[in-house]
């Protein structure tokens, strides 16, 4: 028995009608297919349904780190009424962007871990989506000598990689016996 909540057979007609209207209104020369997903990296991302775009205007949806692709994905999830906890079950892709981006994030996470281990200085990634942050956290979970956490709010959330045992930026440093003057952190002015 499958524990799939969504399938292409169930939601494809609604996705098809919605995306056809949007792409036609925008004048995009795009085609797409809705299919049950087969994830090459289920430990990082395991969607149940994937929408793959192709056509002459496919590069437009991939500009600016796939901003339009992600916006179409988000609007489609809203149209379907998917709760936030189900957002990883639907994935939009074009030209294998998601797979390439996942590999890029995994390699960046490994490089950041090496840098933090050698310098003992935290490394902060640029802001990224919750899916991308999850991929970085999962890539770092088995790296020794480092830990990661997300900081920031909204579209400014980012992953910070810390040396193991180092305090988080949001955590106060331990105080010495006589109070703040013995803190191991510098005061910001």
Language-model features and meaning:
Residues 1-189:
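RNA-contacting regions in translation and RNA-metabolism proteins
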């Amino acid at each position: 028995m499958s524990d799939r909540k969504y399938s292409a057979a169930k939601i494809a007609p609604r996705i098809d009608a919605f995306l056809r209207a949007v792409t036609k209104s925008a004048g995009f020369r795009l085609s797409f297919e809705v299919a049950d997903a087969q994830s090459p990296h289920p430990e990082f991302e395991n969607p149940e349904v994937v929408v793959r775009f192709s056509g002459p205007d496919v590069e437009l949806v991939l500009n600016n780190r796939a901003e339009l692709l992600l916006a179409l994905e988000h609007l489609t999830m809203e149209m379907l009424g998917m709760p936030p906890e189900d957002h990883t079950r639907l994935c939009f892709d074009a030209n294998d962007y998601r797979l390439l981006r996942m590999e890029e994030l995994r390699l960046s996470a490994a490089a950041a871990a090496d840098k933090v281990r050698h310098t003992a200085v935290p490394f902060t990634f640029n802001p990224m989506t919750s899916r991308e942050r999850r991929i970085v956290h999962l890539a770092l979970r088995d790296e020794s000598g480092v830990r990661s956490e997300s900081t920031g709010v909204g579209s400014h959330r980012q992953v910070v990689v810390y040396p193991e045992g180092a305090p988080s930026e949001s955590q106060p440093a331990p105080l010495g016996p006589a109070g703040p003057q013995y803190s191991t952190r510098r005061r910001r002015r």
